[in-house]
Amino acid sequence: MPVVIIGGHTRSVGKTSVVAGLIAALPAFHWTALKITQYGHGVCSANGEACDCVTADHSLAVSEEKDRSGESDTSRFLVAGADHSWWVRTQQGHLAEAMPRIRKILATTQNAIIESNSILRFIKPDLYLTVLDPETADFKASAQTYLDRADAVLLHSVENSKTPAWERVSLKPVMDRPTFEIHPPTYVTPEVIEFVRARLSRFSPTSHH
């Protein structure tokens, strides 16, 4: 069972669009999709809203998406064709507490695609793609930590003359990795699809449910 992880250096760079695009492009894999969100202090994992709870039962929430309206990220995964879609929420730095639940989900899936950087601390995927936008300055520590584990880079197209907005960030760890230029709103190009298909070819997806 292959596990594909899609990461990125910050919010709103297209990670969800890449996951949805790959699900739609490779339906034979009958994907189970997971989105992992880590909230800062003072935010409840149960609903993502501000709260002052410090109880253990509010530090972790795992829910299966059933809504197919396409309004939420996990709903978009279902609309794209995922067999199942899960949303995992934990407090910042508490992802380890969610791993038993995540591993249980993965054990029952045919193929999994996960939107997260931090999960690389606990899982060695069969494929890790990172989405980078040179015009967005924020660069998560988790994205920088695991940059050297990326099998390929999906790089937002920018004018050559522009200097990346990142500060103190080196892309040397991925200089020798395949880099695919993306032009939103198209996040998954035919080249990206073929790269992923080729890397997962040894798993030969089945055509049955």
What is the role of each PLM region?
Residues 5, 30-34, 130:
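Conserved beta-strand elements of the Class I
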Residues 107-111, 116-199:
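Conserved catalytic-core segment of NTP-binding enzymes
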Residues 1:
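Phosphate-binding P-loop
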Residues 5-22:
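Glycine-rich phosphate-binding P-loop
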Residues 21-90:
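N-terminal phosphate/diphosphate-binding loop that engages ATP/GTP or pyrophosphate donors
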Residues 196-209:
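Short, hydrophobic alpha-helical segments
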Residues 85-119:
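Phosphate-binding/switch loop-helix module in NTP-utilizing enzymes
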